[in-house]
Each structure stands twice: as structure tokens, then as C-alpha cells.
């Protein structure tokens, strides 16, 4: 095996077809064979990063250890490969053009006419090649669909890389949809044929096809696609009920073996130990609970994809299936919506819309003793609710929502104030991994099993230390602080007053893994399961073991 090998994942027909999960699953298979894999996403949009994008359009913003605001697919990569990636794992058109324009303005091109080829494509290639020194394979997912005008420079850069490293060191995998037409009663292969034709017109002949469908594609249709597209390696990736089955599906169809042979990789036998326990927990669950995600962006589940997967993983060890109940913070019937849930999670967000609904839902959860986990904005709203209804600070709020409140129990971080005045919103929050020291004997410390932790962050606002003492005097526990900046990182209620009520300023969902569930989510699932079992015992439906 000579040098780093490259695998490019492209998509056709429609977006959101599963390129990211295909890339993550293939990366997992190669990792399980002993290879060192680095994986990244190329996003063709002009935004520098997704940090300022609407979650209802783009989905969640995934935070890396080094503080990059990245595409949600980077979260899939981390979970499937069980690695921590950095900011080089997500490249956008905005980043590329910003860099090239900066180089031009500073005279680095020595008066050349700056063009898409070679200057933009050279910068894309440079970023594709950024990876640790000991890597065997770089998997690069190219966002969007072939034929999109925004994707053309990325496709061209990938073509050039294949020419530079040699065809034997580069593999192109094209993911395409094979739709089923109800009126005709058959699957249609023509969209995939056209998609591959567009890719070939750009100078790329795919080496393998991953055909997405809701129903199995007939052998005749697979052979037809292979013939018409001149591709021998054709894999049918049928929609599965849980995403962690995808590595098994791709392996059963031999995709990883094909890639290893094509790239002449020195790979060992596959070790399924990482996925065996996860799949067993999913397929053989012993119990089932319902946890509400109460948020502002429930219209698009992808806005909370890492929270969803963290909750699911929280139940794997105890073989507990976690069903998600979506509760919009603007819902007028929150009391009814939260009537029979076993637990609640209030994730992050921005802006004033839906805030009063969040505060109302949090009050319901606190007073009904529903196990509750607040994340970022969720924790801030927990503090606001407590200040209003327990401490008596009527009208308490955050300076994010109003400047007129008498009780700004959540306020703008000191270093963020000038940033907001100058309207510098992109990439300027408190981002990345920060340390917190937890109080001995607290719920937080008992869940983590230590008092010294690091979590990923993405915020501009903090709990106001000026009101902390009054909150503490009325029973709110400040159980974790960042000692360097004296920031409140964790709050909770005494377990004598509430079975599980905890909030964190961090985004713990970003560090959860299928095999290593995050302790906060694992704790929430355990508390929710206990609540359900007690309720069933009291109603005579079951006997506690």
C-alpha cells in the first residue's frame, strides 16, 4: 500500500439520500478492519460554516472539540468511527473562497488572474488532503447532488486528485435513488442512469454504486443499472429501521471488500465487537420509555439529531428502547402533551420565539417531578423558570430576549458584548471544549464519576453570577463551574426534592457514542425508566424486581 488512499462519496437524483451515513458506515467498516480512516464533508454552500444558518433549513450544528461549527454529518462520522474530529473535517465554499480572496488581496498570486481553475480547485484539494500523518484512507463526502452548479468546483477537484494520485489510489462511490413509481407499480432506473451520465460528463466514472430504495431492487434492475452505467460493483442499500444496521448492510453486499481490493489496502478481518452489543440492545430491548424533546425546531428532527442519538444510546446498556415524543414549545396544550411522558430533554436554541412555552414546559416537568435534562438554552430556561416561580423574581429573563427585565438572571458573557455591538455573529461564540469542576456529592458528579470534566460548548449567554446566591438560597444547586472564567456550567435540584433535574451549559450530545453513551443521557434514561416502573407498580401493572 503506497501513500494515502482517497474515497469520494457523491450523490445523485435527490439530496438527503444518505451519503453521510454511507460514508460513516464505510469508514466504520474500514476502521474495524484495522485501517486508520479520516473522514470529511465538503459543503457547496457559500456560508463559511453552518453556525448562522436556520436549524429548520440546515439541521443541527455539530460542535467539534476544537470549536468548529460543522455539518450534522460530522456528528455521524464521530459516532460511527468513535473518533474526535477537528475543523478540517468540514469544508465549505465560503471557506474556500474566503481563503482564495485573502491570498489575492495580499499579493500571494503575484498578479495572476484568479480563477475557479486552478485557484479554487487547488484550495479545495489542499483542504481535502489535510489529515493526520498516520492516516491510511481519507473518505470525502461531497455534499449536494451531481449537476448542482455549486458542486462543480468540488467535483472537478476530486477528478484532479484521482489524476494526481492514480486511479488505483482513488475510489469513487456514487449514491443514487431508485424510486418506486406507484402509478406504474415499478422501480425506475432512469434517474440513476442520468445521474451517472452527469458525473461522467464531469470526467468521473464511478467505481461503485450504492442504490438507495425503500424496497429491494430486483436483480434484473441492478444488472440493467450496472450495464447502462458501466459499473460492476452495485450495492442495494434498502432503508433500514435503524441507522446502525447500515454497516452490516454494506458489508453483506461486499462494499468494503470491493474498496479494499480496488485500493489494494492491507486490511485485516472485520471485528464486529463495536457493533454487536449495540445491535443486540436495539433488537432485543427489555423495556421501553417515552422521552419528550421540547424545543423550538421540532418541525425538523435533524435539528436535534445528536440529541436523538444520545438519548437512544443512553438506553443501549440497559436494553431500553427510547421513543421520542416531539413537543413544540409553541404548543398551546403543553399540559396534555407532557401528561404521560417518562422524561424530558430541553435542547439548545436561539431567539425569543417559543421561550415562554419552554419556561412553561419546564415548570410542568419540575412540579410533576418528571426527570429532566436541560442543554444550553434549556439550562438557561430552567434558571429563568426557577427564578420566576420559586425565588419570586417575577419577569426574570435573559438579556438575549429583552433589555428591560428587572431580573437578568441570564446575561451576555462579558467578552461577547463588543462582538454583538459590532454584529459579528459568525464563529464568535464560546466554542469548543472547556473544563468544568463539579461539586462533590452532586448529581452531576455522581453521573460523571469524577469532579473534573471537559465538555463542548456553543453559547454567548451565561447564568448571571450576580443572582446565583439568591437562587442557591432557595434550593437551586450550582453543581459545576468553569473555574478559569467563573462561569456556571451545571445546575440541579437536590434528589430529595426531585428525582432527576439537571441542566448544563454545554452540549453533551456531541460526545455521546453508541458504545459509550454520555452519562447525562444515560442518567436521564435510567431516571425515566424508574419513573415508568414506579407508575406501573402503583397501578398494579407490574411487580418491581
Curated annotation (Swiss-Prot):
Positions of region (Amidoligase domain): 1-265
Residue sites binding L-glutamine per the record: 349, 377-380, 400, 460
Gene Ontology CC: cytosol
Active site: residue positions: 376, 507, 509
Enzyme Commission (EC) number: 6.3.4.2
Homology family: Belongs to the CTP synthase family.
Protein known as: CTP synthase
Species this chain originates from: Tropheryma whipplei (strain Twist) (Whipple's bacillus)
Amino acid at each position: 500500500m503506497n501513500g494515502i488512499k482517497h474515497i469520494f462519496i457523491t450523490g445523485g437524483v435527490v439530496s438527503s439520500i444518505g451519503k453521510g451515513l454511507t460514508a460513516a458506515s464505510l469508514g466504520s467498516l474500514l476502521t474495524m478492519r484495522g485501517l486508520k480512516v479520516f473522514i470529511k464533508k465538503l459543503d457547496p454552500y457559500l456560508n463559511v460554516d453552518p453556525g448562522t444558518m436556520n436549524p429548520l433549513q440546515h439541521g443541527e450544528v455539530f460542535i467539534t472539540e476544537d470549536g468548529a461549527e460543522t455539518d450534522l454529518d460530522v456528528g455521524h462520522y464521530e459516532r460511527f468511527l468513535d473518533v474526535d474530529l477537528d475543523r478540517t473535517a468540514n469544508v465549505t465554499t465560503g471557506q474556500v473562497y474566503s481563503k482564495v480572496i485573502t491570498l489575492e488581496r495580499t499579493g500571494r498570486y503575484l498578479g495572476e488572474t484568479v480563477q475557479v481553475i486552478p485557484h479554487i480547485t487547488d484550495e479545495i484539494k489542499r483542504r481535502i488532503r489535510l489529515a493526520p500523518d498516520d492516516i491510511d484512507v481519507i473518505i470525502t463526502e461531497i455534499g449536494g447532488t451531481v449537476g448542482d452548479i455549486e458542486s462543480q468546483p468540488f467535483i472537478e477537484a476530486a477528478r484532479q486528485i484521482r489524476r494526481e494520485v492514480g486511479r488505483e489510489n482513488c475510489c469513487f462511490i456514487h449514491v443514487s435513488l431508485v424510486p418506486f413509481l406507484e402509478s406504474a407499480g415499478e422501480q425506475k432506473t432512469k434517474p440513476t442512469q442520468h445521474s451517472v451520465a452527469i458525473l461522467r460528463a464531469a470526467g468521473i466514472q464511478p467505481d461503485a454504486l450504492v442504490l438507495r430504495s425503500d424496497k429491494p431492487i430486483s436483480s434484473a434492475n441492478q444488472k440493467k443499472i450496472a450495464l447502462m452505467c458501466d459499473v460492476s460493483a452495485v450495492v442495494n442499500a434498502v432503508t433500514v429501521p435503524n441507522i446502525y444496521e447500515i454497516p452490516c448492510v454494506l458489508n453483506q453486499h461486499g462494499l468494503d471488500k470491493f474498496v479494499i481490493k480496488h485500493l489494494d489496502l492491507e486490511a485485516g478481518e472485520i471485528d464486529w465487537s463495536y457493533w454487536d452489543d449495540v445491535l443486540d440492545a436495539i433488537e432485543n430491548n427489555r423495556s421501553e420509555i417515552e422521552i419528550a424533546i421540547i424545543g423550538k425546531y421540532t418541525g425538523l428532527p435533524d435539528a436535534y439529531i445528536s440529541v436523538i442519538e444520545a438519548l437512544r444510546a443512553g438506553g443501549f446498556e440497559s436494553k431500553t428502547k427510547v421513543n421520542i415524543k416531539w413537543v413544540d414549545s409553541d404548543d398551546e396544550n403543553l399540559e396534555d402533551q407532557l401528561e404521560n411522558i417518562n422524561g424530558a430533554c430541553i435542547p439548545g436554541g436561539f431567539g425569543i420565539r417559543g421561550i415562554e412555552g419552554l419556561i412553561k414546559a419546564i415548570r410542568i416537568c419540575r412540579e410533576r417531578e418528571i426527570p429532566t435534562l436541560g442543554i444550553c438554552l434549556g439550562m438557561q430556561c430552567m434558571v429563568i423558570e426557577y427564578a420566576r416561580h420559586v425565588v419570586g423574581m417575577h419577569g426574570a429573563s435573559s438579556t438575549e430576549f429583552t433589555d428591560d427585565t428587572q431580573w437578568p438572571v441570564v446575561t451576555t458573557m462579558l467578552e461577547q458584548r463588543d462582538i454583538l455591538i459590532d454584529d459579528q455573529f459568525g464563529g464568535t461564540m464560546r466554542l469548543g471544549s472547556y473544563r468544568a469542576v463539579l461539586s462533590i456529592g452532586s448529581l452531576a458528579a455522581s453521573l460523571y464519576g469524577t469532579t473534573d470534566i471537559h465538555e463542548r460548548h456553543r453559547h454567548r449567554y451565561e447564568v448571571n453570577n450576580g443572582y446565583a446566591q439568591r437562587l442557591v438560597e432557595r434550593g437551586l444547586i450550582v453543581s459545576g463551574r468553569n473555574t478559569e472564567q467563573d462561569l456556571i456550567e451545571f445546575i440541579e435540584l437536590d434528589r430529595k426534592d426531585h428525582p432527576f433535574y439537571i441542566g448544563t451549559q454545554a452540549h453533551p450530545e456531541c460526545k455521546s457514542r453508541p458504545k459509550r453513551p454520555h452519562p447525562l443521557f444515560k442518567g436521564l434514561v435510567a431516571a425515566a425508566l424508574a419513573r415508568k416502573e414506579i407508575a406501573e407498580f402503583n397501578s398494579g401493572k407490574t411487580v418491581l424486581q
